[in-house]
Amino acid sequence: MSLTAQFSPPVTGITRSLRDTKPSLSNLRVFPVYTEIRTMTTSNLRKSACFVAKAIEQRRDTAGSESESEATPSPAEESGSGEDKEVEISAIGAEIKAAMEQRKTAEEEKGKNEFLSGVAEEVKEIEWPAFQKVLGTTGVVLGVIAGSSVVLLTVNFLLAELSDRVFIGRGVQDFFS
């Protein structure tokens, strides 16, 4: 079985046209509509790339007809190589399946005792902050809670005194009777 491939040589250099490279008035706009301003050099590059692509296609067409007879294997070779590939694929599939079964049985053997040791291992891997930083942050949080509690209780006391003076000791139940 022989496989042959032909690759075209890499294209190097830029082809230049013999036209004047000064931009014409049609290419210059006072307020460009497109985000890309088209100049003569960009249009020349696009055209040269197009010509290069056409040349490569033509070369492949001429070279492709010569190499088609070499690249096309006979039907007897195809059937033999196809069976070999199927055997290789099935052997690889069997190896993968056996490895998966071994992994599954190994995981079942470890059982749930492995769970707690895994948790302990993960806790060890956590990057804990410094103890002093934790105490400082906790102190700030407790201070904010205590301060806001004092402020809210003071506002509640003042509003209760104000309502007692405005309504002269009458409660809510006195308004409905």
Swiss-Prot record:
UniProt-listed Gene3D superfamilies: Preprotein translocase secy subunit
Membrane topology: Single-pass membrane protein
Mutant phenotype after disruption: Seedling lethal. Albino seedlings with yellow and translucent (glassy) lateral organs when grown heterotrophically.
Transit peptide feature, positions: 1-38
Assigned keywords, A-Z: Chloroplast, Membrane, Plastid, Protein transport, Thylakoid, Transit peptide, Translocation, Transmembrane, Transmembrane helix, Transport
Start-end of Low complexity biased regions: 64-79
Compartments, as annotated in UniProt: Plastid, Chloroplast thylakoid membrane
Cellular component per GO, a single term: chloroplast thylakoid membrane
GO molecular function: protein transmembrane transporter activity
Pfam annotation, one family: SecE
Record-annotated membrane-spanning stretches: 140-160
UniProt region (Disordered), positions on chain: 60-87
GO terms classed as biological process: intracellular protein transport; protein secretion; protein targeting
Family: Belongs to the SecE/SEC61-gamma family.
Assembly with partners or alone: Part of the Sec protein translocation apparatus. Interacts with SCY1 and ALB3.
Function comment: Involved in the import/insertion pathway in the thylakoids. The signal recognition particle is not involved in the insertion of SECE1 in the thylakoid membrane.
NCBIfam families: secE_bact
Name of the protein in question: Preprotein translocase subunit SECE1
Organism: Arabidopsis thaliana (Mouse-ear cress)
